[in-house]
A protein has these predicted regions:
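Short, residue-level hotspots on alpha-helical faces of the histone-fold
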Residues: 12, 31-32, 129
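Short, amphipathic C-terminal "tail helix"
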Residues: 95-131
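Gly/Pro-rich interdomain helix-loop hinge
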Residues: 17-20, 24-97
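Short amphipathic alpha-helical surface patches that serve as generic macromolecular interface elements
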Residues: 11, 73, 98-102
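Glycine-rich phosphate/pyrophosphate-binding beta-alpha loops
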Residues: 1-26, 108-113
């Protein structure tokens, strides 16, 4: 995907607030944002090609031809834990800033590349999960 998406939209905003490496911010957000994207796609755009791409990614990540999208999300989350990447709050992101971060992320140019427009509530849920 040459476009970026909500993970990078969040990372740009959060990177200006805390002294955490861009890659670590992205890693902390990848599973929750992927989960939010998949849920939103299934609810609002069930025929979107991104769902097939997420399933193919899950197969590649897990090495299993029967892998589900959920298996891929769990693989990402497990890998992030194994790498010792902490949540964003441990990196210094104040939970009181969640609404501000969500607002700025929603209007970020990177977020416009997301496979589906996430609502502020969906963005907030993903960010809180990454804390």
């Amino acid at each position: 995907n040459a476009k970026l998406g909500a993970v990078h939209g969040f990372a740009g905003v959060i990177g200006g607030l805390v002294p955490v490496a861009h890659g670590a911010i992205c890693a902390a957000l990848l599973a929750p944002v992927t989960e939010a994207n998949v849920r939103a796609l299934r609810e609002r755009a069930a025929d979107h090609p991104a769902l097939a791409a997420y399933r193919q990614a899950a197969e590649l990540l897990t090495g299993r031809s029967d892998a589900t999208v959920e298996d891929g999300v769990e693989w990402i989350a497990a890998t992030v834990r194994q790498l010792g990447i902490t949540g964003l709050a441990a990196g210094g992101l104040d939970p009181a800033l969640v609404d501000e971060v969500v607002d700025k992320t929603g209007s970020s140019s990177s977020t416009k590349g997301n496979p589906i427009d996430l609502t502020p509530a969906e963005l907030q849920q993903a960010l809180v999960a990454a804390l």
